[in-house]
């Protein structure tokens, strides 16, 4: 018998193994931090009964609710998989671990493509990582615990009779299998590269499958379980200067910066994303750069282990399942020559414009049910075509005005989720591990945006007393506002100071003119909603105002701003941007696209602050105006 557990926000769930052979125990608790002390609900199910309806609660999304289309959004995140199939895969890798025990010490073998349509990273599948059982005994899953329901994945902890725990990552089926296949293949290869070549501590991956044809019946990654605490536990962005927790604050900045330093330490030979070289046997060789991923490798086991292929950066794949992959997407995904760094920006713009055009065509043909105003899509086309048009001129790649320009343009590994929430410090050795590499790609450091946990685009305040006139005479409310700006400025400054300590040749990437030049591209990469194309326009219009100065200083390629905006264009943009800001301010939970953490949602619903409508949507009850 196996037992499985649905834990809440808790990163760790410790439960005893069931002694009832052939069944699994399921434990479900509330999905929030404040409720993790609640006694979990336990359900037993037979290992061989994949159709047991009692399992469904284990696979359902529970960490939040949506104000609109709640049922549909949760159904998109239903992660049912075959527990029996998982058990078979664990037995397979256990057999492989015994075979690997005979391999020469230090030998790094290539990934093995198994007959069951999974891939094993056999260099990680060794007895010390997998564990041991008695002779003639079979590997048995004893407990399954759902420990995290993130934006893109459901994370399960798998306890076994090997005296080892594993992590099973199941991506939500938010996109088609082709998208998930590229994403998983690249992420696994990138983590392997980070481990073996860059010396970054990552959870060891043992096995993965890129579609639902494997025994798990879902795309999956099976990897090492790291016992520990998230680095986020020590991060307080609003800490007072000189606080007793200053050392923790400084350590978080240091740990994340050290990871970044290792990620960008090696100059690569193309822009795109990393894959295993033996992925070539099942793919189109034109997808991959033929030359070595980097120069100077002397270890024969690492030579030709990886290749650069199409970029899996999220913005290039998000909401594009309706496009013809080979005709409408592939031409814009790279890989790109290291001689053409601005092609990344150009192709991002062209792909998004193609996406908007296709959506308009589908809507006009009556084959799309999405509720989107045609004007918004038409405006997106104009915006993204402008981004593609200006891309070759955004940076003068031969300028001497920006120190170390060629260093800034070289392909380097970029991690999109470099964040203390994505770093775990293991319990025993207190070593930091970088967890999730989804969407990692190689691109110039000059186009890499700052980590979100320290990013700040507001007014900069470096000293409250010097920068703010009569600060001491302000009201408490005004002081709090300025203190917030100061602390956000301080956080970003501390991050950039650490970047200068670790990588002084790259520090000019955070110079204000350079940030402004890349801002249209960053706005495109970070766009979350349909209306946020306006933020790209805003960045382009800001560039228009200073373009002459940049041209005089040899920062850009063209003396004249490459785009044309009429007075009416600018007035319409100002009006639309104002409406967007008003919408963000007036619409509850607009920043999370209507998603609410489940404990907060339950409290608001029970108090009457949220009201369910007849169509299943929810509205936030506005407070009555005082007389």
Swiss-Prot record:
Superkingdom per UniProt: Eukaryota
InterPro entries: Kinase-like_dom_sf, Mito_inheritance_9
Transit peptide: 1-43
GO CC field: mitochondrion
Keyword Mitochondrion: yes
Family: Belongs to the AIM9 family.
Protein name: Altered inheritance of mitochondria protein 9, mitochondrial
Organism: Saccharomyces cerevisiae (strain RM11-1a)
Gene this chain is encoded by: AIM9
